[in-house]
Amino acid sequence: MDQYCILGRIGEGAHGIVFKAKHVETGEIVALKKVALRRLEDGFPNQALREIKALQEMGDNQYVVQLKAVFPHGGGFVLAFEFMLSDLAEVVRHAQRPLAQAQVKSYLQMLLKGVAFCHANNIVHRDLKPANLLISASGQLKIADFGLARVFSPDGSRLYTHQVATRSSLSCRTTTRSPLRSRCPCPWRRCCLTSLPRHWICWVNSFSTLLTSASQLPRLSSISTSSQLPCLPIHLSCRFLSV
């Protein structure tokens, strides 16, 4: 850590704290994710290992956040990423007015190119959401947080876990016990991402073919109850809220 000067705290995730830092020699601004090891015998957390492996296997790409270095520090280790000014969730949340169509198209194009690059390298992200889409000062969008990523089996022989992150953007296929033998969750999440802000809803129709069926579109805005989903898989079980 001696080669970096901490400039401030960016945030905190499930497995570590993220700091904004400056490389002492080069002056480069980076984001440092400090991951502490709870017990030495447990070794590296699986999510951190997956993220490192996925980013190293894919290499550099303008639509995927760059991992610059990994090094031990104290009772844990540090991942050094290129610094990005914000994320899509913050951009939408603090927008004074609806985003221009040209800006929406630009973000969506960069997202799709990033996902295409991941899939071309047999990497399935499995946790696409606005908070994991980082935005640079120049407006460049990059996919980040590959902690739930998996190496995809082209022949479809590998069965994947249902634990594919955020419940609010889980695909219909995932919630109905269907085996995850394909890249299915990513197309669904791309549609969920474009439907989040109200002024983005029009873009969902353009990508309806990415869903299992166009007839599923009206259900995106509906609220499910326990009677409508009596056989919800155990890995997704939770108490339904009264509305």
Curated annotation (Swiss-Prot):
> Can you say where in the cell this protein is located?
Nucleus; Cytoplasm; Cell projection, Cilium
Q: Keyword annotations for this protein? A: ATP-binding, Cell cycle, Cell division, Cell projection, Cilium, Cytoplasm, Developmental protein, Kinase, Nucleotide-binding, Nucleus, Serine/threonine-protein kinase, Transferase
Which biological processes are named by the entry's GO terms?
A: cell division
Q: What is its EC number?
A: 2.7.11.22
| GO molecular function terms attached to this record | ATP binding; cyclin-dependent protein serine/threonine kinase activity; protein serine kinase activity; protein serine/threonine kinase activity
Keyword Zinc appears in the UniProt entry: no
Q: Name one GO cellular component term.
A: cilium
Q: Which residues bind ATP?
A: I10, G11, E12, G13, A14, H15, G16, I17, V18, K33
Record's Gene3D superfamilies? Answer: Phosphorylase Kinase, domain 1, Transferase(Phosphotransferase) domain 1
Q: Which ranges carry the Protein kinase domain?
A: 4-243
Q: Which reaction does it catalyse?
A: L-seryl-[protein] + ATP = O-phospho-L-seryl-[protein] + ADP + H(+); L-threonyl-[protein] + ATP = O-phospho-L-threonyl-[protein] + ADP + H(+)
Catalytic site: D127
Q: Which family does it belong to?
A: Belongs to the protein kinase superfamily. CMGC Ser/Thr protein kinase family. CDC2/CDKX subfamily.
- Assembly and oligomerization: Monomer. Interacts with TBC1D32 and MAK.
So what does this one do? Required for high-level Shh responses in the developing neural tube. Together with TBC1D32, controls the structure of the primary cilium by coordinating assembly of the ciliary membrane and axoneme, allowing GLI2 to be properly activated in response to SHH signaling. Involved in cell growth. Activates CDK2, a kinase involved in the control of the cell cycle, by phosphorylating residue 'Thr-160'.
| PANTHER family from the UniProt entry | CELL DIVISION PROTEIN KINASE (PTHR24056), CYCLIN-DEPENDENT KINASE 20 (PTHR24056:SF171)
Name of the protein described by the UniProt record: Cyclin-dependent kinase 20
